[in-house]
Design a protein with these regions (language model features):
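Active-site-adjacent beta-strand anchor residues
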Residues: 5, 27-30, 73-74, 99-100, ...
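Nucleotide donor/acceptor-binding cores
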Residues: 1-2, 69, 142
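Internal alpha-helical scaffold of NAD(P)-dependent oxidoreductase catalytic cores
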Residues: 89-90, 109-118, 133-236
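Hydrophobic anchor at the start of a short beta-strand
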Residues: 3, 25-27, 97, 119, ...
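Rossmann-like NAD(P)(H) cofactor-binding subdomain of soluble oxidoreductases
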Residues: 52-135
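Short alpha-helical
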Residues: 32-36, 78-79, 104-105, 154, ...
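NAD(P)+-binding Rossmann beta1-loop-alpha1 motif at the extreme N-terminus of oxidoreductases
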Residues: 1-50
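Residues at the C-termini of beta-strands that transition into short coil/loop
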Residues: 30, 48, 60-62, 101, ...
Length: 238
């Protein structure tokens, strides 16, 4: 398959590299790392095995990438409104779009722009960061929870097959709203406490009794909000 990766940071770069390693034609939209990846390729350090993609298809604009079978958009949620102009040049008649992003209200925007039939949501449960330009450090986990915007089982099976071909653990969520709240149960407590604590890591939070209790209380609050939201949407998943 041809795959365009928009927002090729640590997350998009890692999963795109996995798919490229599996033999797919993956093209990356890079900004900061463009020159380094063109010159030295993309290197991944991972508990699943280190690897180096010596020749990587990279571009500085989505127009250079062109239409693809799949678009993986892994922008930050704060950049959601810029996604349309970045993704549009990569969309052909049969292109599917995977919004590999955190937060709520992601898929409705993509559905509005491109049509719900081609849109998927994806939530990455992974510990990962970028090192020097063109280097990605995968530390732990790696599962992606996916769901089609119209809950089409056949579409979900197609995306699941694509991701698993790249040795990516993939789970089809009961529904997208459930999956997004599930991810927020982690993001809201730990991202918030990390920033409030001056950039402290997860292990520091878990190792401090007071911070751990704060994280647990925040998680319980997110669960309550999520379940209330799912009830209002008449979702059977809790």
């Amino acid at each position: 398959a041809t795959i365009a990766v928009i927002g090729a940071g640590a997350v998009g770069g890692y999963y795109g590299a996995r798919l490229a390693q599996a033999g797919h034609d993956v093209r990356f939209l890079f900004r900061r790392d463009l020159a380094a990846v063109r010159e030295r390729g993309l290197r991944v350090y991972s508990p699943l095995g280190d690897f180096h993609l010596e020749e990587v298809a990279v571009a500085a604009s989505p127009e250079e990438l062109g239409p693809a079978d799949w678009v993986i958009c892994s922008l930050k949620a704060t950049a959601l409104e810029s996604a349309r102009e970045l993704v549009a040049p990569c969309v052909g008649p049969n292109t599917r779009i995977v919004a590999l992003m955190n937060g709520l209200g992601i898929e409705p925007r993509f559905a509005e722009w491109f049509g719900a039939w081609r849109v998927f949501g994806g939530m990455a449960f992974v510990c990962i960061n970028r090192g020097e330009s063109g280097v990605i450090h995968h530390l732990e986990y790696g599962r992606i929870s996916i769901g089609h915007a119209l809950d089409d089982p056949a579409e979900n099976a197609t995306l699941e097959a694509l991701l698993t071909s790249g040795n990516i653990e993939t789970v089809v969520a009961p529904n997208l709203r459930y999956a997004r709240w599930e991810k927020l149960c982690w993001n809201i407590p730990f991202n918030g406490l990390s920033v409030a604590g001056g950039g402290i890591g997860t292990q520091t939070i878990l190792g401090d009794p007071e911070l751990r209790e704060t994280a647990e209380r925040a998680m319980r609050e997110v669960v309550l909000m999520g379940n209330a939201d799912l009830v209002s949407w008449k979702s059977p998943a809790r």
